A protein has these predicted regions:
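N-terminal strand-loop-strand
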Residues: 1-21
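Short, intrinsically disordered, charge-balanced linker/junction segments flanking boundaries
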Residues: 1-2, 115-118
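Alpha-helix C-terminal capping segments
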Residues: 12, 118-119
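Short, surface-exposed beta-strand-loop junctions and turns on beta-sheet-rich folds
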Residues: 17-19, 27, 113-114
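A short, polar/proline- and glycine-enriched secondary-structure boundary/capping micro-motif
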Residues: 19-24, 97-98, 118
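Unchanged
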Residues: 25-111
Length: 119
């Protein structure tokens, strides 16, 4: 979960829902490196600093007819970035936005249950 200097949270809009940037670890990466890389790739936001580990979440999804359990490691990050966003459209990301407390509450009404656990 990324916050800027104003305390706003970085959200992505993908598959008709507000979500937080995340992704899979690549060969040779540790989990913290993955977290930073995925935010940069999915949003264009740079200058990220991990401040703390938050929690793990789990969710079940179906791939090729089989159910799978996905573990996500969540970190708190901060940035002073105030540049232009670069949504990773080939990953289905249609919008990137900073959201204040009121807008975050609204976004969470159209989000995933595991994302709501972070707030």
């Amino acid at each position: 979960m990324v916050r800027n200097t104003a305390g706003e949270v970085l959200f992505i809009f993908r598959n008709g829902k507000w979500d937080l940037p995340k992704g899979k670890t690549e060969k040779g990466e540790n989990i913290e490196q993955t977290a930073v890389r995925e935010v940069e790739e999915e949003t264009g936001v740079t200058g990220l600093e991990i401040t703390e580990f938050l929690l793990h979440t789990y969710h079940v999804f179906k791939r090729n007819g089989e159910y799978r359990l996905k573990l996500t490691h969540w970190y708190a990050m901060e940035t002073e970035y105030n540049g232009v966003f670069a949504p990773q459209e080939d990953e289905g990301i249609m919008e990137v936005a900073w959201k204040d407390e009121t807008a975050t509450k609204e976004a969470l009404l159209n989000s995933y249950e595991n994302i709501k656990l972070l707030f």
